[in-house]
A protein has these predicted regions:
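Short, flexible, basic/aromatic active-site loop/helix in glycosyltransferases
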Residues: 130-156
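N-proximal low-complexity "stem/linker" segments adjacent to membrane-targeting elements
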Residues: 1-24
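Glycine-rich, basic loop-to-helix element that forms the pyrophosphate-binding segment
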Residues: 58-75
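Conserved donor NDP-sugar-binding/catalytic core segment of glycosyltransferases
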Residues: 91-122
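Short aromatic/hydrophobic "clamp" motif used to bind/position activated sugar donors
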Residues: 80
């Protein structure tokens, strides 16, 4: 069974569409745990959606990693999936994702992410350094880190919008580092997986749709959170590279 964790921050309409996709395309063998990080406005009766959902409601807002770690403790599946509420599906991605996790040393797998027009999104990247971050800030557009072809490959890290882990692996690395409230918790987690000898995998044979919101580019609060997470990550590396 696959336990799917979805954290909603007033993403009720998006989450309902995703749940409908899961009901349409994923034929059994899934458990869905949805966390209301803040109360939905207007309120959503999750018992009326087309697929069974276990709902967790926070008394106060928590970070991305904390929400998914909490859902993991409530989950029962052999595999644990972190899934953003604004992702859409057009087919069942899980057979290909689980097939990729059967490879030796696979610690996490992600599908290829495309936007609603079919353009490939940069959801797999090399680990950031101060130099690469400055280059990205000063040069636009920056070429993608990886050329996407048809075959699965092993990037440095994959984005947290859609990740699938073997349960034992997620438990071994103790999940997300909850000191990252938002942003870079996925980078940090993939770095810790690699240090333990696991591979990060992306398979273009599975696809999901995500239209990037880029809140950190528009909102000062999100930008400040992004900057704090970047600094935490760069300063926490055991052998930091410039």
């Amino acid at each position: 069974m696959i336990s799917i964790s979805i954290a909603s921050h007033r993403h009720g309409p998006m989450a309902r569409r995703l749940l409908s996709d899961l009901d349409t395309y994923c034929a059994g063998g899934i458990e869905i745990i949805l966390t209301e990080n803040v109360p939905e406005d207007p309120a959503v009766d999750w018992s009326l959606v087309s697929v069974p959902v276990k709902v967790l409601r926070n008394s106060e807002p928590r970070g991305f990693g904390a929400n998914h770690n909490s859902a993991f403790r409530q989950s029962r599946g052999e595999f644990f999936c972190v899934l953003n509420p604004d992702v859409r599906l057009t087919s069942d991605p899980f057979p290909e994702l689980l097939s990729e996790l059967s490879a030796p040393h696979a610690g996490v797998v992600a599908p290829l992410i495309v936007d609603s027009g079919g353009a490939v999104q940069e959801s797999a990247r090399r680990f950031p350094t101060l130099v690469s971050l400055l280059r990205k800030a000063l040069i636009s557009p920056v070429p993608p880190d990886y050329a996407i072809r048809d075959e699965p490959f092993s990037p440095d890290w994959v984005a947290g919008m859609f990740m699938v882990f073997p349960r034992d692996v997620f438990r071994e690395i103790e999940g997300f580092d909850e000191r990252y409230f938002l942003y870079y918790e996925d980078v940090d987690l993939c770095a810790r997986l690699r240090r333990k000898g696991y591979e990060i995998r992306l398979t273009p044979r599975a696809r999901a749709i995500h239209d990037a919101q880029r809140d950190s580019h528009r909102d000062l609060e999100y930008f400040a959170r992004h900057l704090r997470s970047v600094l935490r990550y760069l300063l926490s590396r055991p052998q930091r590279r410039l």
